[in-house]
């Protein structure tokens, strides 16, 4: 990628949260949140879209997921709790399940232990993007195009950070740094070193 002319370089602040539980939702307006749950929600969502899902609808609670799916009719109901497929759901949270044959042309309603909670908690942000190792360069480019300060919001596990999410946050932050001038918080700096 050719360098961006200096007069076009945007300065973006990047802040990383190790767990969505710690995310201050009253400070999201004007920010682009990149929600990261590498193992597995984010990877499932990205892989589902790659394989032709018409849309992905993240839902925090199971009752709402079932209700939305039943109203929609022909859709795929996906989800897990504690890494276990939910009885009555079509698929769980393994990207290998999000094949073109399974999700192509269909809406996917997904509810997971951590990932969809992180996405839903971000709804007051100006923009919400899904980040994983599968799309770190593309999501970084889109975040820079949007021009807002960025929050890398790791889903974590049980309210604590997960190394896989921090690793992906570092890959995304590093990709953003190749595109623009960026101010990094300490956790973002550390994630870039992982």
Feature-to-residue mapping (PLM):
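Acidic, polar low-complexity linker/tail segments
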Residues: 8-32, 50, 59
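Phosphate/ribose-phosphate-bearing ligand recognition and processing surfaces
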Residues: 155-165
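Short acidic, Gly/Ser-rich segments with clustered Asp/Glu that frequently serve as metal-coordination loops
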Residues: 21-23, 33-45
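Structural motif
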Residues: 13-15, 31-34, 54-57, 74-77, ...
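A short alpha/beta connector and helix-capping loop motif
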Residues: 42-63, 71-76, 81
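Solvent-exposed alpha-helices and their adjacent loops that cap or buttress functional pockets
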Residues: 5-10, 24-28, 68-70, 99-103, ...
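Long, charged alpha-helical interface segments
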Residues: 2-3, 90-117, 121-127, 141, ...
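Extended, compositionally biased flexible segments
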Residues: 66-70, 74-91, 95-98
């Amino acid at each position: 990628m050719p360098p961006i002319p200096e007069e076009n370089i945007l300065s973006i602040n990047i802040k990383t949260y190790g767990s969505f539980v710690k995310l201050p939702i009253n400070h999201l307006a004007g920010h682009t949140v990149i929600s990261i749950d590498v193992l597995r929600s984010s990877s499932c969502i990205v892989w589902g879209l790659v394989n032709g899902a018409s849309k992905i609808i993240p839902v925090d609670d199971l009752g709402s997921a079932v209700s939305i799916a039943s109203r929609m009719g022909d859709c795929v109901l996906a989800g897990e709790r504690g890494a276990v497929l939910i009885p009555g759901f079509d698929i769980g949270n393994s990207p290998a399940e999000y094949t073109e044959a399974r999700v192509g042309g269909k809406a996917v309603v997904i509810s997971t232990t951590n990932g969809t909670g992180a996405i839903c908690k971000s709804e007051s942000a100006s923009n919400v993007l899904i980040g994983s190792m599968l799309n770190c360069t593309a999501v970084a480019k889109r975040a820079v195009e949007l021009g807002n300060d960025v929050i890398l919001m790791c889903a974590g596990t049980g309210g604590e950070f997960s190394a896989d999410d921090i690793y992906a946050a570092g890959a995304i932050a590093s990709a953003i740094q190749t595109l623009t001038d960026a101010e990094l918080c300490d956790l973002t700096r550390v994630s870039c070193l992982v």
